[in-house]
């Protein structure tokens, strides 16, 4: 059965708090299934209430706990009806819980439960040795996500257009990351004060501190750029000026007694990542600042690995990026970091300055839009990419995706194939360039290229890079960026580009359930990945792929190391009703 005949509510008509809860709880349910934390069964002909018709549901079980949610679409299942992979857009509001339910017992006595932290507590109570303090923290992060998500539903930023600035597009993001239950978390870690839902995180007042020159590591043109911003003689000779995010001041005061706070502030506009800001007086730069707040998986600080590698990687990026206009990179040419052998301390006082092309490209009639903003559906139906790019027919959506995929593979897959270098090309790190049409021109708008930013998450196979360029990426010991097995770099790009980027775009263009979107991607990939290649083996030949386990990683308190589980390879998806049948796997590092 395709879809569900069960009566469902349009979540856009719900109160903001209910919408915020379901945004996080639906992601949590998906994690419970895809990470193998609960067994999930597809039931095709079920009624959950007397007034409902028959439809399909997902039944999740763990010991005596049952979670039941109706389905808008058929997920990927095996011959016995076990659900192998689920997406939040497969789910319909609301979520129910019950005790010791089986397929034959539905409909049964069910209790509605859309609160993600309540669901997490029910699940954790049935797991062995689940640490109580860890559970408390995890639930607090879920609650934070709901609070901030609900507030954004109540007070969204104005809807952007192709004529909007890049920062307006950054700040227009509502739901953000498509699969992480803590997608909108703003969980402050003491001594940082709680970030209230109504706190203005878009417009910030930065604090200026200085450190003794021998207490920091400075790279690139950091001091020259800071001199453009500060009054002369603001900072004494022998000290280095550093801008600090307003939320981070308590950490700096408590961790760095040698820091001096100066009577000077700077107004800034925050990008979608919260910690990266644009200063209007220096529009061609973006300043990435640490902040002791957990957003999704980890605290948003900046490690010495990142501040060291960024400026030193520029000559390599100049060599490996395809010689075309397809991809520009936001060079991290300048940085500063506290000098401390304990990186857990040093990462709290740092700054990375990178190029920002948006103002320059706008003068050349190009809109620069963070990719995550394009796939948002503010009104719950049509994605922004369809509206602002005038993709009013399936043919135009197919053409948009075809061009997008072709450009993306040239930009991100070619450096991996030729040089063993994997960008972290997910939606927040990738900016889409679109030519702004003339007034009155309603023809479809197609992408012309990308900008990639944020290199702290890149993966590089140094031996492959050295063979192709004669260079190696300079790194500090213990860094997470080097991989000894080239397969790890392919797994990294698969996660960021295929699962976290193209998957969301294909769904936004309504080309997923038909299978047409994935047919386009496979066809394009076959041009680059040939039988016998590592990439072909991992991406096009294997029925399974690695899925990043967000909840399992939180349970093990991992942020630098990843935990994966085998799930169906989305690249081989043929369409609803034609799902691949195979077995999943156990989680492993």
Feature-to-residue mapping (PLM):
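Nucleotide/phosphate-binding site architecture used for ATP/NTP-dependent chemistry
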Residues: 1-407, 435-589
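Conserved kinase catalytic-core segment
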Residues: 393-432
């Amino acid at each position: 059965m395709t879809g569900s005949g069960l009566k469902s509510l349009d979540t856009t008509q719900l109160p903001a708090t209910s919408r915020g809860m379901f945004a996080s709880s639906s992601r949590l349910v998906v994690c419970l299934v895809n990470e193998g934390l609960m067994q999930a069964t597809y039931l095709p002909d079920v009624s959950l209430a007397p007034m409902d018709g028959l439809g399909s549901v997902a039944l999740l079980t763990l010991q005596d706990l049952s979670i039941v949610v109706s389905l808008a679409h058929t997920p990927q299942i095996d011959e016995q009806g076990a659900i192998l992979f689920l997406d939040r857009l497969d789910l319909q509001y609301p979520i129910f819980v019950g005790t010791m339910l089986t397929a034959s017992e539905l409909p049964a006595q069910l209790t509605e439960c859309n609160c993600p932290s309540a669901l997490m507590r029910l699940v954790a109570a049935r797991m062995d040795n689940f640490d109580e303090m860890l559970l408390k923290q995890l639930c607090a992060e879920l609650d934070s996500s709901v609070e901030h998500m609900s507030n954004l539903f109540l007070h969204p930023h104005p809807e952007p257009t192709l004529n909007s600035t890049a920062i307006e597009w950054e700040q227009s993001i509502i739901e953000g990351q498509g699969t992480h239950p803590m997608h909108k978390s703003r969980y402050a870690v003491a001594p940082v004060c709680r970030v209230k839902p109504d706190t203005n995180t878009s417009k910030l007042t930065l604090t200026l501190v200085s450190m003794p020159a021998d207490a920091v590591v400075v790279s690139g043109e950091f001091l020259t750029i800071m001199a453009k911003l500060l009054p002369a003689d603001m900072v004494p000779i022998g000290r280095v000026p550093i801008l600090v995010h307003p939320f981070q001041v308590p950490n700096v005061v408590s961790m760095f007694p040698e820091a001096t706070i100066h009577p000077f502030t700077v107004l800034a506009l925050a990008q979608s990542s919260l910690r990266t800001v644009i200063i209007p007086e220096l529009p061609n730069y973006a300043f990435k600042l640490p902040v002791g707040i957990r957003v999704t998986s980890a605290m948003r600080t900046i490690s010495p690995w990142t501040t060291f590698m960024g400026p030193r990687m520029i000559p390599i990026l100049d060599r490996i990026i395809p010689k075309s206009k397809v991809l520009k990179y936001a060079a991290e040419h300048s940085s500063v970091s506290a000098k401390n052998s304990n990186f857990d301390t040093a990462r709290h006082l740092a700054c990375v300055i990178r190029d920002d092309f948006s103002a320059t490209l706008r003068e050349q009639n190009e809109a620069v839009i963070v990719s995550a903003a394009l796939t948002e559906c503010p009104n719950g139906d049509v994605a922004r990419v369809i509206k602002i790019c005038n993709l009013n027919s399936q043919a135009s959506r197919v053409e948009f995706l075809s061009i997008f995929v072709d450009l993306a593979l040239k930009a991100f897959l070619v450096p991996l194939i030729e040089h063993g270098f994997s960008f972290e090309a997910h939606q927040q790190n990738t900016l889409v360039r679109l030519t702004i049409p003339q007034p009155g021109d309603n023809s479809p708008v197609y992408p012309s290229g990308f900008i990639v930013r944020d290199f702290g998450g890149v993966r590089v196979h140094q031996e492959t890079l050295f063979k192709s360029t004669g260079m190696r990426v300079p790194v500090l010991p213990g860094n997470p960026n080097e991989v000894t097995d080239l397969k790890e770099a392919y797994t990294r790009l698969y996660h960021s580009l295929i699962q976290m980027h193209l998957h969301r775009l294909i769904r936004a263009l309504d080309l997923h359930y038909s299978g047409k979107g994935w047919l386009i991607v496979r066809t394009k990939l076959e041009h680059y990945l040939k039988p016998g290649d590592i990439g072909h083996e991992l991406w096009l030949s294997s029925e399974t792929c690695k899925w990043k386990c967000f909840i399992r990683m939180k349970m093990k308190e991992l942020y630098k190391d990843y935990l994966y589980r085998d799930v169906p390879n989305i690249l081989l998806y043929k369409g609803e009703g034609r799902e691949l049948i195979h077995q999943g796997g156990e989680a492993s590092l």
